[in-house]
Every structure is written in C-alpha cells, then in structure tokens.
C-alpha cells in the first residue's frame, strides 16, 4: 500500500501518520458521541478529530502546492514557488517599478492583437472558400443530366 493511501501529514521532510478512524465510523460519517464516558472513548474521539484536521490540512497543502504557493516534494504536480518570490521582493524594496511590467504587457497585447488579426484573416479566407449557397436538388439533377448527355455523346463519337 502506498504511503499516500493512508492518512498522513508532512512536517519538515518527515511523514506523520495519522491514526485511523474508530471502528464505529465509516468513510462518510464520523462518530463523536458514545454511550460511555470513559477515557478510551475520549481518546478515540480526539484521534477522530486529529484525523479530520490532518486530512483537511493535507488537502490545503496539496492545493497550495498545486498552485505553486508551497512546494510539496511528494507531489509530481507541485510547482516551484519561485514565481511568488516577487511579492517578497516588492515588499522588501518598498514598492515596484511598473514601467518594465507595462512594457511587457504592451508587447504581449501587440502580439495578441497580431494573432487575432491573423485569425480573422484565416476565417475570412475560409469564408471565401465556402460556397455561399448549397446546391438544390434541381441543380444536382440538371448536372447529372448534362453529365449523362456528355457520356452519351462520347459513346457515339468513340463508338
């Protein structure tokens, strides 16, 4: 069985395995009340809470790692958080110079506009290739008759 198949939490490059839910619960419901108020039931309930919190925390960490907010070495889709280091540098420097970003955005917009224009030209050329009106049954019948008359004329000429 894989380690990720069991409830666990990552903490500083170590895997903390969570205790399984008590036998009185299934995958959809958690049992927190019991008929007896002894210490073992309280321990079981705390273990149930520990697992629920651990699973929720693990889910939050997985989502954060997927979007690159934190690096999760166990997840192949985890993104490098270097993209988000720019926020740290902005706050450390006391602000940011937006002129370079505006230049990049302007170049991206120009490139996007040229792509859109190229697509519009391609659509226009495709529109020109499409026949404006479909053939009617009458036109198809006339075409067949003319082809048949040409065939008959060729047969008469060739023999």
From Swiss-Prot:
Purpose: This protein is involved in virus transmission.
Protein name as catalogued: Aphid transmission protein
The family this protein is said to belong to: Belongs to the caulimoviridae ORF II family.
Pfam families: Cauli_AT
């Amino acid at each position: 069985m894989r380690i990720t198949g069991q409830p666990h939490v990552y903490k500083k490059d170590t895997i903390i395995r969570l205790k399984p839910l008590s036998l009185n619960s299934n995958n959809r419901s958690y049992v927190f009340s019991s008929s007896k108020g002894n210490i073992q039931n309280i321990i079981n309930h705390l273990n149930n809470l520990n697992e629920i919190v651990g699973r929720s925390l693990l889910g939050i960490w997985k989502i954060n790692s997927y979007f690159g907010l934190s690096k999760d070495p166990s997840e192949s889709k985890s993104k490098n958080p270097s993209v988000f280091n720019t926020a740290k540098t902005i706050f450390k420097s006391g602000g940011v110079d937006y002129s370079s970003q505006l230049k990049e955005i302007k170049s991206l917009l120009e490139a996007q506009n040229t792509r859109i224009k190229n697509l519009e030209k391609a659509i226009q050329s495709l529109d020109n290739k499409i026949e404006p009106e479909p053939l009617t049954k009458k036109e198809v019948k006339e075409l067949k008759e003319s082809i048949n008359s040409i065939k008959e004329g060729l047969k008469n000429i060739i023999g």
